[in-house]
Amino acid sequence: MLRRLTTLVLPVIMLAASATAEAAAMDKCPAQGGTVRAAMAGSPPTLDFITSFAAQARDMGVYIYEGLVTVDGNYDVAPQLAERWTTSTDGKTYTFHLRKGVKFHDGSPVTAADVVASVERFRGQSPRKADLSMIASVQAVDEATVEIALAQPSAAFVPLLAYPGPAVAIMPKKLIDGVAAGKLPQTAVVGTGPYRLAEWVPDKHVHLERFAQYSPASAEASGYAGRRLACIDHIYFLPVPEVSSRVAGLESGDYDYAQNLPAETYKRLTATKGLKTVILKPYYEIVMHLNTQQGQLKEWKLRRAIQLGLNEEEIMLAAAGDKALYRLDPSLFFKEQYWHSTIGANRYNEHDAAKAKALVKDGGYDGSPIRIITSSDFQFMYNAALAMESQLRQLGFATKVQAYDYPTMIDIFRKKRADWDISYNAFSIRTDPGGFTFVLKSDSGYQPYASKEVDTLLEKALVERDRKARLKLYEQVQDNLYKDIPMIKHGDLFGFDALRERLDGFAPYYTTPRFWNVWSKDKR
């Protein structure tokens, strides 16, 4: 979920808006040719798109592979290899009709048999296979039609099918049959996307080249969906884990693009001639979990005192480092999504220290430290924890902060609940609110919080097919979270990347640099 860290700055916002409109309207490339050298925060552990949560696998996989469906600029479901689909009246059978004339990178046509093999492989080998556990069967009706039957209706099925990573990538049946998880050879890294793999040298580069036989969708470009044109001939994704090297290489011209840049360079790079800065939003929402089952915060009044007393503006500025790189927002879902809601907002960022201090006393606080765990891997998370700790001290709490690498922090959060009172985390965008079921449902064991009412709401929302009715259910979930206080959201963090001005048409989206529908003004 966090491995990308390994959506007043009007010029930036206007750049994104104009580039999006320009790219969406393109029927052909304004210019063809050239090379992009992109400095990435890390190297992909694999290019077998279905098997890894790693952001680097997604960032490169979306160029190579496509699915039946994907997500658009509003993070809603959009067709990709499927031109359309229908649903049976009982909501248990989905029939997908494939686009005609689509070819894999090896020149073979895409058939329903390839789709069946790919979906079945995902169900057997992907770490996200539980998301599609509602599937009962997958079968080819004919060469261009696939039928997927569900064991029970699920409103989340198609959105989860569209989720971009690990994605349900469609690959040639002949290349994936019998291949074990983690054993896909480089010669089998074959998809239908606008770029194909030319060479992968681990920890050195991933070289993608334009796929001349690519068959783009006819709809306007939006998010990962629509008409994706490969105007650049070659893309080199270069792992540059040292952030100072990414910045220096971008400024010197060694790199055309650099991702995941530090906030302290934002103003300078924005003002640098020949460069453009882009803000990625939404990116992550920063949250802290409160231990509702063990320790002092089992007492609701103490949790309420913390919720009541926090100054979220101060915490988010400390986390992001620049006012352009965050926003305050109370919703469990991002503003860019249909599911955004202000339910419970009256309990967000109240910043009432006097009432909070009174509740600390009334809640029977015994003076022992509130134990806060955070991650030293991610500066924003660490900085947020320190700013929040300072505020707790002002409210009358003693505190103790312990910083770990991210995997260790999550292990303590999940398995050693007697060892913490507050644990930090961050969530990226979910294409469907059903993605939060695992985080919130009592029987998942993800966090200490357990609520029969929330469990019932989540179960109803997973099968409710009316969108407005689902929204109301998730609003009730959000309302319960604000009342029960198992976690507190600080705000939305934005990402910050930069590129050279010779690249035109670029529009930020999600956490992935999109170089389709982008062209080089000098063709080099």
Model regions and ranges:
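Gly/Pro-rich hinge or "lid" segments in bacterial periplasmic/extracellular proteins
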Residues: A162-Y236, S244-S245, A354, A358
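Long beta-strand-rich cores associated with HINT superfamily self-processing modules
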Residues: D497-R524
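Ligand/substrate-recognition segments at binding pockets and active sites
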Residues: E242-V243, Y326, K357-I429, D443, ...
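Periplasmic-binding protein-like
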Residues: Q293, L297-Q337, N383-A384, L481-K489
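N-terminal lobe/hinge region of extracytoplasmic solute-binding protein
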Residues: A39-T89, E120, V190
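Surface-exposed binding/hinge segments that line
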Residues: A31, A130-I176, A188-V201, R502
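Extracytoplasmic/peripheral linker and loop segments enriched in polar/acidic and small residues
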Residues: D27, N349, L395, K400-I410, ...
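Structural transition elements
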Residues: Y195, A324-D362, F378-M381
